[in-house]
Structures are given as structure tokens and as C-alpha cells.
């Protein structure tokens, strides 16, 4: 749940950043209505119970209602949606919920019944949700990747400024504790 929480905290901060761009023609106070955070989890038996608890705390998951079969047919995935105003914070290596009053976040959670690997999850995202949501851009994160406070905005801006742009990627930096660079002379330089 630590990796998931770290990513979601970064995503939530990006949504707040876009809502605070009050002079923008595209973003501003109601920007959260233009953003849907889709979470795809690969396998109901594989998902970390603490991550499930975090998702339940955010309001986008209900434990105990998912079934393997309905009317004798195998279930492929379970889909939950919710607009949350609950935030997340990290305390050491654990994610925890915190009350949040400012920016709502629209969440869509797909819990695949079977573990079918990452590419299948991407296919779910693009073929199932992409068709329904019809987004202008999509930004993909693996759990554990922490976007900077305006990273998603900067990626959106690249597409907005160049409509023929088919793809973009952000910069990835290693996250180190304060002072850890000094232990490795290659990183310290």
C-alpha cells in the first residue's frame, strides 16, 4: 500500500495544482471534473489487503461483494467508481487516510478477477475505459511512481501546445532520503 499511496498522493497534488490554475482557460476551480483517475489492479487474489483497505477508505472499493461467477458465467473484472474527498498521507512506510475538504477526485477502480499481467491491464485501460471516457490525453503510472506537483500538467501542456504529438514522457528521478547522496560518489557529483 505504500507504493500505491505514494503514487496517489502525487496524482492528488497534481489535480489540486490544476484546480489552482484560476487564470487558465482549460483548468481552474472545476478542473477536477475533467480528470478521472483510473486504477487497474491485476488479480483479485493478488491485490495487497492493505491496498484494498486504502481503496475502501477512499470510497472506491467495497469488500465482500465481488463474486467469481454470476449466473454460471465467470466474471472478468469488477468495476467501482466514486468521487472522493478523502486524502492520503505517508507516515513512514505506511499510507494512511486523512480528511480532505478542498479538491474532489473522480476515481474509477477496475479489479480484474485473474492476474493477467501488465499489458492486459493496459489493454483494459485503453479499450474499456478509453472508449467510455474518450479522454484527450492519458497518463500512465506504475504503483510507486510519484509524480511531481505539476508533472501531469506539464505532460498535458506538451499535448496542448502540439496537437500532432502522439506521445510524451516525463523525467524520472531516483528518490533518496536527505543526505543519502553523500554515500555514493557517483550520485553526489
From Swiss-Prot:
GO function terms (MF aspect): chitin synthase activity
UniProt cross-references to InterPro entries, sorted A to Z: Chitin_synth, Chitin_synth_fun
Catalytic activity: [(1->4)-N-acetyl-beta-D-glucosaminyl](n) + UDP-N-acetyl-alpha-D-glucosamine = [(1->4)-N-acetyl-beta-D-glucosaminyl](n+1) + UDP + H(+)
Broad class of the protein's primary localization: membrane
Compartmental location: Cell membrane
UniProt EC number: 2.4.1.16
Keyword annotations: Cell membrane, Cell wall biogenesis/degradation, Glycosyltransferase, Membrane, Transferase, Transmembrane
Pfam family, one: Chitin_synth_1
Covalent S-S links between cysteines: none
One GO term (biological process): chitin biosynthetic process
GO cellular component: cell septum; plasma membrane
Membrane topology: Multi-pass membrane protein
Function: Polymerizes chitin, a structural polymer of the cell wall and septum, by transferring the sugar moiety of UDP-GlcNAc to the non-reducing end of the growing chitin polymer.
Family from the record: Belongs to the chitin synthase family. Class I subfamily.
Name under which the protein is recorded: Chitin synthase 1
Organism of derivation: Exophiala jeanselmei (Dematiaceous fungus)
